[in-house]
Regions:
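Short, low-complexity, charged amphipathic interaction modules
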Residues: 182-206
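Loop/turn positions that initiate beta-strands
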Residues: 155-159
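Short alpha-helix capping/helix-loop boundary micro-motifs
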Residues: 140-153
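Active-site signature of cysteine proteases
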Residues: 175-179
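N-terminal capping segments
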Residues: 1-119, 164-166, 197
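A short beta-strand micro-motif
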Residues: 4-8, 161, 187-191
Length: 206
């Protein structure tokens, strides 16, 4: 049985120039994990932020005032900011898209550097921006091993899966989730010509 994922998928008739709000009930939705030819998984270094992001994603999906439309993709973000990032309090119809929803969730979770990206760009990130800019914020690890991209077994709640044109959030831990939280990953870097071992704990605290 696959884990559940949250996503913004498609408007009532397509991707652009849609009616505000979730007209079909499936524009934002919870679905089963699938192999979407993922290029990377963005994992929150803080489990607390991961949980806040997942809760925001779930709340956005439940709020039928939030729909899908690439043309007005930032209106949900601005509405969320106006209510202190509690998306359940959005009472007027607004829009988002797949990557704009993930950005909203990250900012609601307390990722100040992601919020700074939005301010600098004047726009939510695309999937390209997510893969290239989010790891540099310090809030995320970018995981590209096949065990994260081709199966849900090693995913954690709050993980953000990114492909060339779509992004979703894991809303449950995979079957190996406990091991993922506890494992200490050994990596190596070269400093002044010398190899130095670095140990990074996956379930880093705030």
């Amino acid at each position: 049985m696959s884990i559940k994922i949250g996503q913004a998928s498609l408007g009532e008739t397509g991707g652009r120039n849609q009616q505000p709000g979730n007209q079909t009930g499936r524009e934002l939705n919870i679905s089963n994990w699938y192999n979407g030819r993922w290029l990377g998984v963005l994992r929150y270094k803080s489990r607390k932020k991961a949980e806040r992001a997942a809760q925001t994603c779930e709340a956005a999906i439940k709020n039928r005032n939030i729909g899908y439309d690439m043309s007005d993709r930032n209106t949900a973000y601005e509405a969320a900011r106006a209510v202190g990032w509690d998306v359940s309090k959005i009472t007027k119809p607004v829009e988002t898209d797949c990557s704009a929803l993930m950005m909203l969730c990250a900012v609601a979770a307390g990722c100040a550097s992601v919020e700074a990206l939005y301010r600098r760009q004047g726009n939510s990130c695309t999937t390209y921006c997510m893969l290239h800019d989010w790891p540099a914020t310090g809030d995320f690890d970018l995981l590209t091993g096949s065990k994260y991209l081709t199966t849900d077994a090693n995913l954690l709640r709050g993980d953000v899966l990114v492909s060339e044109g779509h992004t979703v959030m894991a809303l449950e831990d995979g079957k190996n989730g406990e091991g993922e939280k506890e494992v200490v990953e050994k990596s190596k870097i070269i400093v002044d010509g010398k190899e130095i071992k670095i140990y990074a704990e996956k379930n880093a605290a705030d």
